[in-house]
Amino acid sequence: MSRSIRIGAAVAACAVMFVLGWGVAKTGVGQAVPFASLTDLERDFTGRMQNVVLVGHFTIEGRETRGGSPERYEIASVTKIDEDQWRFDVRMVYASVDVTLPVVVPMVWAGDTPMVSITDFSIPGLEGTFTARVFFYTDRYAGSWQHGQY
């Protein structure tokens, strides 16, 4: 093998490792705050969010339909990965979207209620940005979403 091919292969391998490293850091894969260090509320939340399905309806402003359109979020797990960063391993099904991926989002607490709070937030694998406030209380969820122009 010629020297230039070996150098090219080494550069390509470095580029692939960089992209993989960036992806792992961005998604928080492999990271987790030790379970023992979670508060009681955080432990309760992670327990409730194991292998759950959130089913609801959404509307698009200006195009509301009676009852809305169906949405479905299949959550395999939720993991705290940093002070206010949580990873949702989720399958999202809404409109023409059907994707499974890890999504790392900031979470804030309103007393005993966890809330995802994102503004102009990019989710790798999905186009556009998202703004949302979604809260979870016992076995319920509710919130407001905006995706791109909708």
What are these regions (language model features)?
Residues 41-42, 48, 52-150:
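Central antiparallel beta-sheet cores of small beta-barrel/beta-sandwich binding domains
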Residues 2-49, 53, 57-66:
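Amphipathic/hydrophobic helical signal segments and adjacent flexible N-terminal regions
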